Regions:
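Alpha-helical transmembrane segments and their membrane-interface boundaries
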Residues: 1-67, 116, 135, 154-159
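Loop-to-transmembrane alpha-helix initiation sites
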Residues: 10, 68-69, 114-127
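Residue-level signal for the membrane-embedded core of alpha-helical transmembrane segments
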Residues: 15, 77, 123-124
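C-terminal ends of transmembrane helices
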Residues: 19-30, 79-93, 133-138
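Small-residue-rich segments of transmembrane alpha-helices in multi-pass membrane proteins
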Residues: 39-49, 72-75, 99-112, 154-156
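Alpha-helical transmembrane-segment detector that highlights a single hydrophobic TM helix
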Residues: 60-81
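Alpha-helical transmembrane segments and their membrane-interface exit regions
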Residues: 125-135
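Intrinsically disordered, low-complexity non-transmembrane regions of multi-pass membrane transporters
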Residues: 137-159
Length: 159
């Protein structure tokens, strides 16, 4: 059984890590920002903590699999992420935000089960992807900075 201190640490770490990803989305004015990412991560962490708690209580009475609840979280976040995706004449927008919601759900699940270092590493890699690869996309690939992640500038600009 986890102590209150362990539970608080896991929940707080989930908020901090997922908040960092959400802050990047907020700064770039995406559909889902700081609060949404924090709530997805916090909820995922709490669901994992609850799953572990239930598993611990009933492990000798009923065969349970704590991973089943985690799988439900990932499926549910897929629906939430789909709500951030917008398709118009210019292309598709919101794919990166949908992916970031999926990542923070995984970070929340990882912190909830005590897999703290991988949760931290995944957050760092997500932030590197969101902050630094944006620059590479703009300069090397010629992507527009309008949130449209499926449209590219013409290769022969000015012709």
């Amino acid at each position: 059984m986890l102590t209150d201190a362990q539970i608080i640490i896991r929940l707080t770490l989930s908020v901090v890590l997922c908040g960092l990803v959400g802050l990047e989305r907020q700064v770039h004015r995406r559909n889902a920002g700081l609060r949404t990412h924090i709530l997805v991560g916090l909820g995922s962490c709490l669901i994992m903590l609850t799953s572990l708690y239930i598993f611990d209580i009933y492990k000798n009475e009923v065969p349970l699999d704590p991973a089943r609840i985690a799988a439900g979280v990932i499926t549910g976040i897929g629906f939430l992420g789909a709500g951030t995706i917008i398709r118009d004449r210019e292309g598709v927008k919101g794919l990166t935000t949908a992916a970031s919601l999926w990542v923070v759900a995984a970070v929340g699940l990882a912190t909830g089960c005590g897999f703290l270092r991988p949760a931290l590493y995944a957050t760092v890699l997500a932030l590197v992807t969101l902050f630094f690869l944006r620059h590479i996309e703009k300069t090397v690939l010629g992507k527009e900075e309008n949130g449209n992640h499926d449209s590219y500038k013409a290769v022969n600009r000015g012709k």
